[in-house]
């Protein structure tokens, strides 16, 4: 994973954790946790691709990896919709910038996961 992506994740997660969105702070914490989870999942797929011999161990260790992949894409779609919704409803420029960067990062992560998964299939 390239260092810009790592710093982007860390920067966005840090800024999102500082936001005070009133009653929706639990939802925001959920988004942060899901983003962190997606980052870890994307990293593990990338590592598996780099060690192509791990494909068989990945499949034998977790025969439901395609199902997991499908769930991750659903999670990404949910997060994208949630970020878009928050982006539409906020007038705070700090939040707008943060959510726009989060949206861009989600789209990049989705593309990377697709690329990795096609290489593993």
From Swiss-Prot:
<feature type="short sequence motif" description="Nuclear export signal">
    <location>
        <begin position="85"/>
        <end position="94"/>
    </location>
</feature>
<keyword id="KW-0946">Virion</keyword>
<protein>
    <recommendedName>
        <fullName>Nuclear export protein</fullName>
    </recommendedName>
</protein>
<keyword id="KW-0945">Host-virus interaction</keyword>
<dbReference type="InterPro" id="IPR000968">
    <property type="entry name" value="Flu_NS2"/>
</dbReference>
<comment type="function">
    <text>Mediates the nuclear export of encapsidated genomic RNAs (ribonucleoproteins, RNPs). Acts as an adapter between viral RNPs complexes and the nuclear export machinery of the cell. Possesses no intrinsic RNA-binding activity, but includes a C-terminal M1-binding domain. This domain is believed to allow recognition of RNPs bound to the protein M1.</text>
</comment>
<comment type="subunit">
    <text>Interacts with protein M1. May interact with host nucleoporin RAB/HRB and exportin XPO1/CRM1.</text>
</comment>
<keyword id="KW-1048">Host nucleus</keyword>
<dbReference type="Pfam" id="PF00601">
    <property type="entry name" value="Flu_NS2"/>
</dbReference>
<keyword id="KW-0813">Transport</keyword>
<comment type="similarity">
    <text>Belongs to the influenza viruses NEP family.</text>
</comment>
<feature type="short sequence motif" description="Nuclear export signal">
    <location>
        <begin position="12"/>
        <end position="21"/>
    </location>
</feature>
<dbReference type="GO" id="GO:0044423">
    <property type="term" value="C:virion component"/>
</dbReference>
<dbReference type="GO" id="GO:0039675">
    <property type="term" value="P:exit of virus from host cell nucleus through nuclear pore"/>
</dbReference>
<dbReference type="GO" id="GO:0042025">
    <property type="term" value="C:host cell nucleus"/>
</dbReference>
């Amino acid at each position: 994973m390239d260092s810009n992506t790592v710093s982007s994740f860390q920067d966005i997660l840090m800024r999102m954790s500082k936001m005070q969105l009133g009653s929706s702070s639990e939802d925001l914490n959920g988004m942060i946790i899901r983003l962190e989870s997606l980052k870890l999942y994307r990293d593990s797929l990338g590592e598996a691709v780099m060690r192509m011999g791990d494909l068989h161990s990945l499949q034998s260790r977790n025969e439901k990896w395609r199902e997991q992949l499908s769930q991750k894409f659903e999670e990404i779609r949910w997060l994208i919709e949630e970020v878009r919704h928050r982006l539409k409803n906020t007038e705070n420029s700090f939040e707008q910038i943060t959510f726009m960067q989060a949206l861009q990062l989600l789209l990049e992560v989705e593309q990377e996961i697709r690329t990795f998964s096609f290489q593993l299939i």
